[in-house]
Every structure is written in structure tokens, then in C-alpha cells.
Amino acid sequence: MTSFKDVLDQLRENQPQGKYGIAFEKLMVNFFRTDPVQKSQFDEVVRWSDWRYNGGKADTGIDLVAHRIEDDSWTAIQCKFYKPSTYIAKNHLDSFFEASGRSFETENGPMHFKNRMIISTSDNWSSTAEAALENQLIPTSRIGMAEISESPINWDVAFPGSEIQINLSPRETFEPRPHQEEAIARTLEGFATHDRGKLIMACGTGKTFTALRLAERVAEANGGKARVLFLVPSISLLSQTLKEWTAQSRVDLHSFAVCSDSKVSKKAEDIATHDLSVKVSTQGADIAER
């Protein structure tokens, strides 16, 4: 099975260096259209040159633009196709921050980008570049090699000529194993006579996946709708669960993250909120609007 790293290696071998950036942008457009986490958030993703609101201006830092379904807003995206050893400094981000801070004209008048994303094939960030992602007026998140590599995607990419040919597809979802089916059935049986309960399963038996299939059964019995509150002790566990649920879900998920402590990402064992693949909020008013 071809991996994302294999695709990047093939890109470097089959494309002239001057076309690296364009080929990677096209690959990321298809990634956003196929990855279940991104696809659930955005209904349109295009390169800057193809965006109807670019005002006829050339790309000066913004490579892709995505339309967020939830709030009818636009997200500016920068794609950095670097060698894994490249060190990302703050000055690598300045032109993107400047360009995405400007307004753009639409048929409904001027608008601003409400979110930013930075995609990079290097995970080596300087402390100043890392700090630049924090406390931005326009929330800024990043997507690195690990997140893209772990995406449940079949990477079908070819180079028949001078142009990259991309045909990505989602991987198949799993069926519950016998012990998981039994856990789901017994839980539903318990809910028939009780309004709460506890499902205890051993480590490595697929608790997260079982919880997803259980939630889907509850939604099915409720006309296709259900509200799930998933409590976790860390942002990293939230990220892991969100990825697995979105990758395996057979119903549409509308997910958002709530963080009770804005400084939780400072803990060494956790990840930063800007590394989460969905919007994060600590504001009650913002959460209530959703």
C-alpha cells in the first residue's frame, strides 16, 4: 500500500523542482476533499489561482482557500513542501499572515478570513515560529506529516507525463468484532431499563471503536440524530478519538472541541490546541452558538 511519504518521494523524483509547490498544492486540495475530518468541515477547497474571490491577484502567501460549512466562512491555507530536515522559522510565515489578514471582495461586500491553516512536510519548528501560532486574532492551526500520514486514505498518485495525476479514495470502514457486538447489544439492553450505565472493556479490545458503533445505533433509533458528550483528560486523546471516529463513522459527524483550560496545551505530555484538526473553544458563548 502506497504511503503519503512514498507519494512525496515520487513527487520529488518525477517533477522538476520548479513544479514542486504546484504539485503539492494539487495533492493537498485532493487531501482536503477526501480526508474524513477535513471533508466534514469544508465543502469547497480550491487553489488560490482558482478562487473566485482572489481579485485577480497573484498568490503572495495564500496557496489554498477552503469554505467552512459550519459558519459560511473562508479559511486561508498555506502549503509548505519542504524537506523533512528544513527548520521552519517565523519569517517563513510572515507573508502568509500578512496576506490572510487582508479583506477580500465578494458579491455580498468585503469579507475577512476567519481561520488559517498551515500544512508542512517538515515538523521542525523554531520556538518563535511555534509561538507565532498562539493568540492570533485569526485562529491558526497546523497540519503536519503525522496527521496526513495517518489519514484513512488510499494514496493513488501517478506521474504519466509532466503533470501529477491524483485519484485519492477513503479506506473501507470496519465491522465490529464478535466481542464488540456483544458489548453493544448488552449496553443497548441496559439502556432499555436504565438511563445511565458503565461499559467496561479491557485494554486493546477497541473501546473507542465500540463507542462509535454504539453511538451510531443510538442515533439510528432516534431518527438519525444523537448528541454525544465525549470527555477526555487531554487534548492528545481528544485528537486521537476524533480521528478514529471520523475515519470510521457511517453517519455525518458535526464535531467541535471544548477546552476547559486555555493553558492545558503547555503540559509536556499533551499537544497544542493549534494541532487539533477541528476548531477549539474555551468560550461559552461560542459553544452555545453551535
Give residue ranges: language-model regions.
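Catalytic centers of nucleases
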Residues: Y20-M111, S126
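Structural motif
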Residues: S73-T75, N115, R227
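SF2 helicase/translocase NTPase motor core
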Residues: M1-K19, K39-N54, F104-M111, S120-R290
